[in-house]
C-alpha cells in the first residue's frame, strides 16, 4: 500500500512540474501511469475475502469489481453528459481525451475528478460492507463479461443515487450541497474557463 501511494504521489508531482511544457500525449502518459498506481492501491483496500482485484479491465469487465466500476462510471458519465448539454456545450469536443472515434470526450474529461469520491468510494462500500456478494453477478456469454443480475442491479442504482445525492462542500457556494450539484458547478466553471480565458480549477473533496 505504501509503495503504491508513493508511486501515485510521484505521478501527480510529475504532472504538476510539467505545467504547459508537455504535449497531450505526454500528459495522457502521466494519466495512465497514475491510474495504474491508483488502482494498485485501490485493490489493497478491498477486505471482503471473496472479492479480488488486480487490474482495471474495461470492455468487457472480467471480474465483479471491474463490473461495478464500469457500471458506476457509466452512470457518472451520463450525469456529466446531461449537465454539459444543459450548459449548451458539445460533450464530444474534449480537451485531454480524444480520438477519431466519436465519443463524449468532454464528458470523460470532466468526470475524472468525480470517479474517486462518487464511484470508487461507493464500490468499496458495497463490497467491504457485504451489501453485494459474488453471487450477485453472472457471465454474459455473448459479451464475454461479468455483470450484475437483478435485483442486485437495483441495489447498486439505489446506492449510487444516495451517493451522488450525499452532501459535500464546494468553494463556490456556502454550506453543504450534493455531489450532483457539484458536478453542475464544475461544468459552469469549465464554461467560464473557456469563455473568460481563465484557468479551470478542478474539484477536490475536503475530508
Positions of predicted regions on the chain:
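Active-site helix-to-loop segments that bind/position phosphate- or nucleotide-bearing substrates
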Residues: 1-207
Amino acid at each position: 500500500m505504501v509503495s503504491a501511494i508513493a508511486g501515485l504521489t510521484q505521478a501527480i508531482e510529475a504532472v504538476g512540474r510539467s505545467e504547459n511544457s508537455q504535449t497531450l500525449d505526454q500528459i495522457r502518459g502521466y494519466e495512465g501511469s497514475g491510474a495504474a498506481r491508483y488502482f494498485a492501491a485501490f485493490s489493497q483496500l478491498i477486505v471482503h475475502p471473496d472479492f479480488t482485484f488486480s487490474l482495471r479491465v474495461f470492455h468487457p469487465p472480467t471480474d465483479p469489481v471491474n463490473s461495478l466500476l464500469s457500471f458506476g462510471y457509466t452512470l457518472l458519465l451520463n450525469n456529466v453528459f446531461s449537465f454539459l448539454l444543459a450548459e449548451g456545450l458539445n460533450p464530444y469536443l474534449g480537451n485531454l481525451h480524444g480520438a477519431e472515434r466519436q465519443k463524449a470526450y468532454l464528458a470523460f474529461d470532466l468526470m475524472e475528478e468525480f470517479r474517486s469520491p462518487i464511484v470508487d468510494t461507493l464500490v468499496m462500500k458495497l463490497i467491504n460492507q457485504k451489501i453485494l456478494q459474488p453471487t450477485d453477478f453472472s457471465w454474459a456469454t455473448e459479451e464475454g463479461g461479468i455483470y450484475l443480475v437483478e435485483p442486485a442491479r437495483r441495489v447498486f442504482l439505489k446506492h449510487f443515487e444516495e451517493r451522488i445525492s450525499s452532501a459535500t462542500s464546494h468553494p463556490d457556494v456556502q454550506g453543504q450541497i450534493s455531489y450532483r450539484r457539484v458536478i453542475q458547478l464544475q461544468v459552469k466553471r469549465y464554461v467560464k474557463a473557456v469563455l473568460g480565458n481563465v484557468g479551470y480549477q478542478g474539484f477536490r473533496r475536503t475530508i
